[in-house]
């Protein structure tokens, strides 16, 4: 495959990506199609039964108009249920979570602006906030990556590992740490706190949040009629989890992207030719790495004067 032209490599990568998309669509169609059709038939049967029972006092046209209004409100995150103890969607904690979902591109979709002014503000806010967020993430990544790489460097020196092995061990350790602290542990907490949530749904929510998929079909404490203080506490906890978890996920992804195996795969699809100085910058060989970590045994002699 090394003899392929660059355009053929890109075409191969594109075809593999499209094939993966098609395979995912076929699997989801097979898994989700029957339950969706069953739910649709169940709703239609219940609606027909309700119309037959209350046809005299509630015409079908009025019922359809009422359901349409309820669904339109639900699309903007406005619930029509009588949860009087739950606060408004646009209180301060909910608004903070909404702005965080914009700046992190998570976009849970549980609420959306109704007014034209709100929609215009979201466009301007995202256009200015997303580049600022990317710059902040780049600065934090540059600051935190050396800190998280110190344990891996110590292990590499202790066990006399090759640079490629040390990088792989460091990436695996950081990935396992992020998976346990920001994926498994929050999922267990969510599973224990939210009674109507299974462990699979909790893991599904955590992964959807940290991967910025943000499907929004599950949101902790949303629509449960909780006391306002508990609801606000849950919103702030979710906000902190989203910000810290995304930063940890980006650090793990950056560590994996620097692996020699990953760089070799990326280089395979890049333009052929000799490696540039930028590719070689900061790369030490095994002998250089060993010399840089061993202190000299002999003291440094000062300048001698001629006799």
From Swiss-Prot:
Question: Which range is the signal sequence, renumbered to this chain?
Answer: none
- The name under which this protein is listed is Potassium channel subfamily K member 7
Task: Give the primary localization class.
Answer: membrane
GO MF annotations in UniProt:
potassium channel activity
Task: State the species of origin.
Answer: Mus musculus (Mouse)
- Which residue positions carry a glycan here? 83
**A Pfam family annotated for this UniProt entry:** Ion_trans_2
Q: Which residues lie on this side of the membrane: Cytoplasmic?
A: 1-10, 141-172, 254-307
- How does the UniProt record describe the way this protein sits in the membrane? Multi-pass membrane protein
Identify the PANTHER family for this entry. POTASSIUM CHANNEL SUBFAMILY K MEMBER 7 (PTHR11003:SF31), POTASSIUM CHANNEL, SUBFAMILY K (PTHR11003)
Which gene carries the instructions for this protein? Kcnk7
